[in-house]
């Protein structure tokens, strides 16, 4: 007897974009386990499954100030456009910057300018407008920082925010320009890690396993599997590791190569996107 329902199939389809029958078969093969079903779909070649599965269902905005980046969520984009909601986000990121706060719990306990805690200010506005509001995440970097905010639509507040902490050998505009280019790169290509060494070992191993099983499913010869797997893992690194990515400004060079030319070292970065995990 199947350990899933028609509603589960529909949910997996909405999550991954794969076909209805493919989703049904993947759930059957994974005994109803959603994470395993996503892997099954990846192995069998469903396009963009991994990327689509990261999506969440939230509205809201991101805001940055003085080394702090905050994501504040609402239930609808109507509220995200509300002036009071945007003012609240500005007050919250101000509290994060002033207190050098990079953790949600600490920021909820911090105070905004009128003396209320961030948690109380959020609760008060939620009660007033009748929607659930949530402080989703916060980052704070204390070094030299470049911030970039991107709007999905002209009538909506920024939905993508990037912070890049960096060191520049020259300390002039060249370094700032390079950091800005990197922030744009992160916003567009969604790097998850700074270096290959930052990718967790279990994540790499899982990518190797999926690459091998995919190659086998495609009928590739056994002797060719190691080379194919290494090639696909290298491709994975180019997708998710910032320094390995081809630069959007010059795709013949990696981000690392362009940063080296500019004498810039990125020490860490954060990328928030409303509606994504």
UniProtKB/Swiss-Prot annotation:
Species name for this entry? Mycobacteroides abscessus (strain ATCC 19977 / DSM 44196 / CCUG 20993 / CIP 104536 / JCM 13569 / NCTC 13031 / TMC 1543 / L948) (Mycobacterium abscessus)
CDD domains, from UniProt? UBA_EF-Ts
Q: Mind telling me which SUPFAM superfamilies this protein's record contains?
A: Elongation factor Ts (EF-Ts), dimerisation domain (SSF54713), UBA-like (SSF46934)
Under the heading Gene3D superfamilies, the entry gives: 1.10.286.20, DNA helicase RuvA subunit, C-terminal domain, Elongation factor Ts, dimerisation domain
* HAMAP family recorded: EF_Ts
**What do the Gene Ontology cellular component annotations say?**
cytoplasm
Name it. Elongation factor Ts
Q: Which keywords describe this protein according to UniProt?
A: Cytoplasm, Elongation factor, Protein biosynthesis
Q: Which PANTHER family match?
A: ELONGATION FACTOR TS, ELONGATION FACTOR TS, MITOCHONDRIAL
GO terms (molecular function) for this protein are: translation elongation factor activity
Q: What family does the database annotate?
A: Belongs to the EF-Ts family.
Record's keyword annotation contains Chloroplast: no
Xref: InterPro entries: EF-Ts_dimer_sf, Transl_elong_EFTs/EF1B, Transl_elong_EFTs/EF1B_dimer, Transl_elong_Ts_CS, UBA-like_sf
* Localization per Swiss-Prot or TrEMBL: Cytoplasm
A Pfam family it matches = EF_TS
Q: What is its main location?
A: cytoplasm
What is known about what this protein does? Associates with the EF-Tu.GDP complex and induces the exchange of GDP to GTP. It remains bound to the aminoacyl-tRNA.EF-Tu.GTP complex up to the GTP hydrolysis stage on the ribosome.
Q: Which parts of the sequence are annotated with region: Involved in Mg(2+) ion dislocation from EF-Tu?
A: 76-79
Q: Which domain of life is it from?
A: Bacteria
């Amino acid at each position: 007897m199947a350990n899933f329902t028609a509603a589960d199939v529909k949910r997996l389809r909405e999550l991954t974009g794969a076909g209805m029958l493919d989703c049904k078969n993947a759930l059957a093969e994974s005994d109803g386990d959603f994470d395993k079903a996503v892997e099954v779909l990846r192995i069998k070649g469903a396009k963009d499954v991994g990327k689509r599965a990261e999506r969440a269902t939230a509205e809201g905005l991101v805001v940055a100030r003085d080394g702090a980046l905050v994501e504040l969520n609402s239930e609808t984009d109507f509220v995200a456009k509300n002036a009071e909601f945007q003012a609240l986000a500005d007050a919250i990121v101000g509290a994060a910057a002033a207190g050098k706060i990079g953790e949600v719990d600490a920021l909820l306990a911090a105070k905004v300018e009128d003396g209320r805690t961030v948690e109380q200010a959020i609760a008060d506005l939620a009660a007033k407008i009748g929607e659930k509001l949530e402080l989703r995440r916060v980052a704070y970097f204390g070094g030299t920082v470049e911030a970039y905010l991107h709007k999905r639509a002209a009538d909506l507040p920024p939905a993508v925010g990037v912070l890049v902490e960096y060191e520049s050998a020259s300390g002039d505009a060249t370094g700032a320009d390079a950091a800005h280019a990197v922030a744009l790169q992160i916003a567009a290509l969604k790097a998850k890690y700074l270096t290959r060494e930052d990718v967790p070992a279990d994540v790499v191993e899982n990518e190797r396993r999926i690459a091998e099983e995919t190659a086998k499913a495609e009928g590739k010869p056994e002797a060719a599997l190691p080379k194919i797997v290494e090639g696909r893992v290298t491709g994975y690194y180019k997708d998710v590791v910032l320094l390995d990515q081809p630069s959007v400004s010059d795709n013949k060079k990696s981000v690392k190569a362009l940063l080296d030319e500019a004498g810039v070292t990125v020490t860490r970065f954060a990328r928030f996107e409303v509606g994504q995990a």
